[in-house]
Curated annotation (Swiss-Prot):
One of its GO terms (molecular function) is DNA binding. Homodimer. Keywords: Autocatalytic cleavage, DNA damage, DNA repair, DNA replication, DNA-binding, Hydrolase, Repressor, SOS response, Transcription, Transcription regulation. This is LexA repressor. It comes from Burkholderia ambifaria (strain MC40-6). The gene is lexA. Residues 28-48 bind DNA. The record marks A98, G99 as: Cleavage. CDD domains: S24_LexA-like. Represses a number of genes involved in the response to DNA damage (SOS response), including recA and lexA. In the presence of single-stranded DNA, RecA interacts with LexA causing an autocatalytic cleavage which disrupts the DNA-binding part of LexA, leading to derepression of the SOS regulon and eventually DNA repair. Its EC number is 3.4.21.88. It comes from the Bacteria. It catalyses: Hydrolysis of Ala-|-Gly bond in repressor LexA. The active site is at S133 (for autocatalytic cleavage activity), K170 (for autocatalytic cleavage activity). InterPro entries: LexA, LexA-like, LexA/Signal_pep-like_sf, LexA_DNA-bd_dom, LexA_repressor, Peptidase_S24_LexA, Peptidase_S24_S26A/B/C, WH-like_DNA-bd_sf.
């Protein structure tokens, strides 16, 4: 890897940890808060320096559009836009009624045209986040979580799941005898789901996040 200053290495390591933990890079504001910068502009300067050194790639206009370069095993890389690439039209899912499919027409409030650079892989829909149970993963109330429909997920991935009549966003971990749905906020309890529970259904995995007000 190109030689980095100590501060640049801190920023690079923070980006990588965020991608490994949540599936998407941090925003400039999150980098600034984590590393004690005076403002997001200071984080932007370090990101541009890293881009000039060829270790990251930045997507213009995307607050989380950061891609690590030259790392074969880096998970959840963002695909940056190429010339002529079409925008994605994604349905926004609001409240979900008990017992009905998450993409049922009555749950879709509108559609958004989104830059593919915002996502780690192609999502199927956006889900409006309610509550702060995933706050420490950078997922806040009112954010739009990009979700790819899946019936399986890996340990550590952030998932969307049905739990009884509710739809929840949590981090998945397998435990003896079942699954643990982990909240990223100490004010919220984790949820244990027994193996084979009819109350649980995986709806998809998180592949990106749009901060409220960015669209």
């Amino acid at each position: 890897m190109t030689k980095l200053t100590a501060r640049q290495q801190q920023v690079f390591d923070l980006i990588r940890r965020a991608i490994e933990r949540s599936g998407f890079p941090p925003t400039r504001a999150e980098i600034a808060a984590e590393l004690g910068f005076s403002s997001p502009n200071a984080a932007e300067e370090h990101l541009r320096a890293l881009a000039r050194k060829g270790v990251i790639e930045l997507a213009a206009g995307a607050s989380r559009g950061i891609r690590l370069l030259g790392i074969d095993d880096a998970p959840h890389q963002f695909t940056l836009p190429h010339a002529g690439l079409m925008q994605l039209s994604l349905p926004l899912v609001g409240r979900v009624a008990a017992g009905s499919p998450i993409l049922a027409q009555e749950h879709i409030s509108q559609h958004y045209a989104c830059d593919p650079a915002l996502f780690t892989s192609k999502p199927d829909y956006l889900l409006k986040v309610r509550g702060l149970s995933m706050r420490d993963a950078g997922i806040l109330d009112g954010d739009l979580l990009a979700v790819q429909k899946r019936t399986e997920a890996k340990d550590g991935q952030i998932i969307v799941a049905r739990l009884g009549d509710d739809v929840t966003v949590k981090r998945l971990m397998r435990r003896p005898g079942g699954l643990e749905l982990i909240a990223e906020n100490p004010d919220y309890e984790n949820i244990f789901v027994k193996a084979g529970s009819a109350e649980f259904a995986l709806e998809g995995i998180a592949v990106g996040l749009i901060r409220s007000g960015e669209l």
